[in-house]
Regions:
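Short, positively charged
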Residues: 1-98, 103-294
Length: 294
């Protein structure tokens, strides 16, 4: 949930939800103390909650109240004293998907929050080698740059005045898919297939995409709250990676997990050269509970 002067609506709602849940936890449980970092994040994100209308605030109150009373109170040990921390976006770069961490000397509850979506994460393409424990790869970096250079050259030929991706799409519907998404997906798919040589690399890729540490994913949907248990997941030893469409990559792990990565622009402006994957997963052995709001 990254802060920006031009933060998308989905991000502001996500920050407001994280703020609301932390406030509810703090008020409901006497054995929890916020860390200095959490206090600072709460202070920053209060404005997003305050910007909600009364109906939205009421919905958040219902969701957070149900999470605390019907789930979290069963996970916390009443005799423990916990700290509540809010983790920065930088943790996700290294595979920790935790947004809220409740920690005691002998217990820990990691929570990943999602508001009206179930994406696992949104990784950028510049760090692909690091996904499989390769610190740097000059050839990958060069190939990535060449794809962008070629795309920008073709875009300038198509329209020398276009500054937005949508302007290119308006002229030629499949232009971005054919000249940017497809070659980038091919690059990533081929690179991972050719460079994953050990089971430890498969495990690193899995942990990066799904989560490095045990956690619970809480998805706040309009009619219910879905809580998924990502505790003690079996680690995979093998993975099959394939490009399934111009903007899609599929990862099939031998522990029953299938990940689908959809490539899309992270900014509307061509000059930012910013793209990222939206990662969704299918899991065979994930326990989950659904808490109805009505």
């Amino acid at each position: 949930m990254k802060e920006s002067d031009f933060m998308p609506v989905s991000n502001t709602l996500g920050r407001a939800f994280e703020y609301a849940l932390c406030q509810k936890i703090d008020s409901k449980f006497d054995n929890i103390t916020l860390t200095d970092r959490a206090v600072a994040e709460q202070s920053k994100d209060k404005r997003y909650y305050d910007a909600l209308n009364s109906d939205e605030k009421s919905k958040y109150d219902i969701s957070t109240n149900r999470i605390c009373s019907e789930w979290l109170n069963l996970k916390l040990i009443s005799s423990n004293m916990y700290t509540l921390d809010r983790l920065p976006d930088s943790a996700g770069v290294n595979g920790d998907v935790t947004d809220i961490r409740l920690e005691a000397p002998n217990a820990i509850v990691n929570i990943s929050l999602k508001h009206n979506h179930n994406a696992l994460k949104h990784p950028r393409l510049t760090r692909v080698p690091k996904w499989i424990d390769i610190n740097t790869d000059s050839k990958y970096a060069s190939d990535y740059k060449n794809i962008w250079d070629s795309f920008l050259s073709k875009a300038n030929t198509l329209s020398s005045t276009a500054t937005l991706f949508n302007e290119l799409i308006a002229i030629e519907a499949n232009f971005v898919f054919d000249n940017l998404y497809n070659p980038l997906c091919k690059l990533v798919s081929n690179y991972l297939t050719e460079n994953i040589k050990t089971s430890s690399q498969v495990e690193s890729l899995f942990k990066f995409m799904v989560g490095k540490y045990d956690f619970y994913k809480i998805i706040d949907n309009p009619d219910c709250v879905l809580i998924q248990d990502f505790i003690d997941l079996k680690m995979p030893k093998n993975v099959k990676i394939e490009q399934t469409d111009k903007s899609y990559i599929k990862m099939t792990f031998n522990n029953g997990v299938i990940l689908n990565l959809r490539l899309h622009t992270a900014s509307s402006r061509i000059s930012t050269k910013s793209v990222k994957f939206d990662v969704r997963g299918s899991f065979d052995d994930i326990d989950s509970i659904t808490i109805k709001k009505n």
